Amino acid sequence: MIVYVDPDLPGITRKKVCNGWGYWTAKGVRITDRDEIDRLNKIALPPAYVDAWFCPSPHGHIQAIGYDAKGRRQYRYHLDFRAKQEAEKFDRLAHFGRALPLLRAQVERNIAGRPTDRDTVIAAVVRLLDEGRIRVGNEAYATENKSFGATTLRNRHATVKGSKLSLQYRAKSGVMRKLTVTDRGLLRVVRKVQDLPGQNLFQYLNDDGTACPATSTNVNAYIKEAMGEDFSAKHFRTWSASVIALEHIVAACRTGGKVKLADLLEPVAEALGNTPTVARKSYVHPLVLGLKDAGFDAKTLPRRTRWLSPAERALIALLDETSEEVAKAAA
């Protein structure tokens, strides 16, 4: 059973000793129980992390915290907690897909507004999340790590040439990303906001004419309001990964070819700027991965609607069908 813990409360600390690590309770008593020492060692908090904190309970959702060389707080979560988080993320994917037309329709309305208006700029950021599959960004990461996302992109990262927006920037973990977007509405906004003072790419003018950068808080609030549920920018990448993988499976099934896992994950990893391993573990829905061997009847692919592609509609149907089967089995 997982217990939610407060990492700001006193916990277990560690010190280097001759044969590895020694651990001390919050009261300063050295831990000698072999099973407890083994538990703490298995957490595998990197030796270079300083000011280490370990959860006194083996059931805490956070098992350890440390600070890396750049002073960033790093967490080690309980494996069961991580599994629960991943399961919840995938469980809500069908709900996200069904609500996506509401968001896309709202973005279409707002992105046609005055290019420097708040809602227009926020809509442009959401369009970039949808089309470019990039992270939303966080100003703290941009300042401390020099890694960027949609809301923290600088003008120097963007080049508009003709009908193309080219982005080149350093993403999470220092990965250099290059992508090209051709969406007309997005380009129209970018051309205008690049003329505003300041380094940030996505800025809007407030009531007194001051340029204000779009933030992840703005974007997530916009998404939640439009979709009517507690969704956020992070859901786009999970959704896109599963759709791209399903599209690859459909294409292979149409030609009668066999789907290899590496070939399936490569386009997903490229689109998200991750490794194939990360794409498999954290982004592509397990049910879609299962189709690699089970196959998919491409003839049953739904028609495109205004706001959803055939693969997106097929993914929703697949997830709904599986949920119904699970519900029947549990009844």
Describe each region flagged by the PLM.
Residues 168-172, 180-182, 292-305:
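Short Lys/Arg-enriched helix C-cap and helix-to-coil transition segments
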Residues 1-148, 154-261, 265-272, 277-281, ...:
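A positively charged, amphipathic N-terminal helix/segment that binds anionic biomolecules
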Residues 288-295, 302-331:
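Short, amphipathic C-terminal "tail helix"
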Residues 263-268, 274, 284-303:
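C-terminal structured "cap/appendage" subdomains that terminate the fold
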